[in-house]
């Protein structure tokens, strides 16, 4: 089941149907078999919230905005089943602050579950509990991720950007900083920071593109807003490169 914002009045599932069709065309392919897209049940927030009560696991993956996520949680909380696990795919927002949007009685079924893009191919998943997360629930969720999805799970603390993005985005920003200092272009930076030094061939700027420039900007802003004492705080900013900013806004 996939939820989206409702479309026009005469076709409220238009947005979610468009999203499912897009899955068939994306590269690298997010589905192992394109025909399996028919297994996805389209849903929208106006008509189908009652369906949530029958779900064992609900994963939220909307934009990296604390206010948007908390508003959504407030809206859907009354419709969650007694045993439903609700998890956020946030890239680095505070899980405890997100949990505050739920009634206290539901917080033990909430946690962070951070997949990496593209999720079909990236092995790592971070599992981040809030203070109220039930230990057995976390164990069950990890078992599902490992056994049925074939993922490698790491438990992370509720710190800014968790583990992977805290290290990885710092690495990207440091590389971009030094690239600018030497007046290196995008292609040269990626040539020097990819397979040549044992890193993924996506290197630096290609990795930023795969992550999603909008998502990357939100992750950088989280570091800027929550790590004021970090030695590199001055560099926690979206690069001012004209080409980068143009790509970000396109």
Which residues are covered by each model-predicted region?
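N-terminal glycine-rich phosphate-binding loop for ADP-containing cofactors
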Residues: 1-250
């Amino acid at each position: 089941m996939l939820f989206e914002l409702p479309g026009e009045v005469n076709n409220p599932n238009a947005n979610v149907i468009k999203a499912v069709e897009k899955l068939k065309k994306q590269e690298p392919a997010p589905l192992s078999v394109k025909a399996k897209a028919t297994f996805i049940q389209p849903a929208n927030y106006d008509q189908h919230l009652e369906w949530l009560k029958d779900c064992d696991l609900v994963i939220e993956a909307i934009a990296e905005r604390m206010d948007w996520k908390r508003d959504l949680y407030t809206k859907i909380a009354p419709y969650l089943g007694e045993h439903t696990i609700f998890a956020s795919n946030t890239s680095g927002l505070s899980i405890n602050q997100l949990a505050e949007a739920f009634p206290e009685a539901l917080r033990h079924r909430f946690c962070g579950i951070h997949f990496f893009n593209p999720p079909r191919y990236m092995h790592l998943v971070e599992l981040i509990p809030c203070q109220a997360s039930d230990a057995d629930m976390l164990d069950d969720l990890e078992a599902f991720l490992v056994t049925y999805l074939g993922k490698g799970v790491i438990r992370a603390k509720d710190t800014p950007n968790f583990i992977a993005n805290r290290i990885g985005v710092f690495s990207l920003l440091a590389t971009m900083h030094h690239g600018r200092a030497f007046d290196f272009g995008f292609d040269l930076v990626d040539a020097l920071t990819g397979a040549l030094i044992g890193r993924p061939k996506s290197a630096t700027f290609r990795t930023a593109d795969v992550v999603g420039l909008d998502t990357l900007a939100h992750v950088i802003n989280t570091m800027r807003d929550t790590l004021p004492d970090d030695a590199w705080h001055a560099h926690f900013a979206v690069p001012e490169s004209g080409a980068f900013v143009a790509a970000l806004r396109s």
